[in-house]
């Protein structure tokens, strides 16, 4: 099945700008440049970020698809300018440059020592590059700014069509973890963002900061785990009919597509695999407004479909591969032992990864909602949602006095 909502990004880390194009969004969704800028500012948050975050401005320009603060039904194009572009106009020029002009530029020195864990090595071989610059410019996590921009339109759609919010928090950084099991709601998002590490527990926050400081002192980097939650989704987004239509498989693909993400779990995920069946599933009982669940171990997804419980998905981020204490590698020009190149980088970008994960979850859930409910305008989509919710609420599992009139 061809996706109703599609997105693509373009641009390099030190190019003039990043561009996001979102195709298939209904008309009438309220979104502004300020909305996108606010989400990009959240992406720059986090203890352990590098120097680039201090001057990255992320100037947003809505290039197409939006007029007077509302989508028009056509592709939405968003440009996010790179504030460092003036320093790179020659080195990253799209047009040919005189080699003599490039020869004396330190920024243009070939990068021939690939970083273990990065795209450098495989990218150089696959695309026949002698310079890793051609790989790392696109492989850089700077590209996620464009995804956050597109995700802002999707999260605004979800809020306006379904009344739901997408939130995230950091569960672990290195060995420091939040073990309380308490999950933030939409009302807690501001509190989470106020935490330097976007943790929803004061004790965990202190431990995470200490972990980052220790890694920084040792010239090292850290990874961690983020969790994304979406409350209030109706039953039935996604499908059991094929693997590609299962919402959990689509969420996993979207999250694994984020730079440095190495694992995804839905609900209790791998912990569920260690339980017996009687302790692994969410038992059901009649309630005043329909079915109630005693737990949410499934993370709001059963059989590839939302089940009415909060959607809960986690992503594991590996430590950043640009390690200040450079790792051993091979020089691709000489074939000799070498130490890996070092580009300016973060000690830890896990807090920012949570914001990027929110954007990807918003895009996938919005895609599933548009596939289910259709419509060319927000008004039409909302009418379709209302009709669907009313229909499933007339089933016997909902008491008669709680059914929509």
Swiss-Prot record:
FMN binds at residues 138-140, 259-260, 303, 318-322, 344. Its cofactor is FMNH2. Pathway: Metabolic intermediate biosynthesis; chorismate biosynthesis; chorismate from D-erythrose 4-phosphate and phosphoenolpyruvate: step 7/7. The keyword NADP applies. NADP(+) binds at residues 43, 49. PROSITE patterns: CHORISMATE_SYNTHASE_1, CHORISMATE_SYNTHASE_2, CHORISMATE_SYNTHASE_3. Keywords: Amino-acid biosynthesis, Aromatic amino acid biosynthesis, FAD, Flavoprotein, FMN, Lyase, NADP. It catalyses: 5-O-(1-carboxyvinyl)-3-phosphoshikimate = chorismate + phosphate. Its EC number is 4.2.3.5. GO terms for molecular function: chorismate synthase activity; FMN binding. InterPro entries: Chorismate_synth, Chorismate_synth_AroC_sf, Chorismate_synthase_CS. Residues 275-286 have a biased composition (Basic and acidic residues). Homotetramer. This is Chorismate synthase. It comes from Nocardia farcinica (strain IFM 10152). The gene is aroC.
């Amino acid at each position: 099945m061809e996706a109703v909502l599609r997105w693509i990004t373009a641009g390099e880390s030190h190019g003039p700008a990043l561009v996001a194009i979102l195709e298939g969004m209904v008309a009438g969704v309220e979104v502004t440049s300020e909305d996108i800028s606010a989400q990009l500012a959240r992406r720059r948050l986090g203890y352990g970020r590098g120097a680039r975050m201090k001057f990255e401005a992320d100037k947003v320009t809505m290039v197409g698809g939006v007029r007077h603060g509302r989508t028009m039904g056509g592709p939405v194009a968003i440009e996010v300018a790179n504030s460092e572009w003036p320093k790179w106009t020659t080195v990253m020029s799209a047009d040919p440059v005189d080699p003599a002009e490039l020869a004396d530029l330190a920024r243009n020195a070939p990068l021939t020592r690939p970083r273990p864990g990065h795209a450098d090595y495989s990218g150089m071989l696959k695309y026949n590059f002698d310079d890793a610059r051609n790989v790392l410019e696109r492989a850089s996590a700077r590209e996620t700014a464009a995804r956050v921009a597109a995700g802002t339109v999707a999260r605004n759609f979800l809020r306006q069509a379904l009344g739901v919010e997408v939130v995230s928090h950091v569960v672990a950084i290195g060995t420091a973890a939040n073990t309380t099991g308490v999950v933030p709601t939409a009302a807690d998002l501001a509190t989470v963002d106020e935490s330097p590490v976007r943790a929803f527990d004061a004790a965990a926050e202190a431990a995470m900061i200490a972990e980052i400081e220790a890694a920084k002192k040792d010239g090292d980097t850290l990874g961690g785990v983020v969790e994304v939650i979406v409350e209030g989704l109706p039953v039935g987004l996604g499908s059991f009919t094929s693997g590609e239509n299962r919402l959990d498989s689509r969420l996993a693909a979207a999250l694994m597509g984020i730079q440095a993400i190495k694992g995804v779990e839905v609900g209790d995920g791998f912990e569920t695999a260690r339980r017996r069946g009687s302790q692994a599933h969410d038992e059901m009982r009649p309630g005043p407004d329909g079915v109630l669940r005693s737990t949410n171990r499934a993370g709001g997804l059963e059989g590839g479909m939302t089940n009415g419980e909060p959607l809960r998905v986690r992503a594991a981020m590996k430590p950043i591969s640009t390690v200040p204490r450079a790792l051993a590698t091979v020089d691709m020009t000489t074939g000799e032992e070498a130490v890996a190149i070092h580009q300016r980088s973060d000690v830890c970008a896990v807090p920012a990864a949570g914001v990027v994960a929110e954007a990807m979850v918003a895009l996938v859930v919005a895609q599933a909602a548009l596939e289910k409910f259709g419509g060319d305008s927000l008004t039409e989509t909302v009418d379709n949602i209302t009709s669907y919710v009313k229909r499933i609420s007339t089933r016997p599992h909902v008491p008669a006095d709680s059914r929509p009139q």
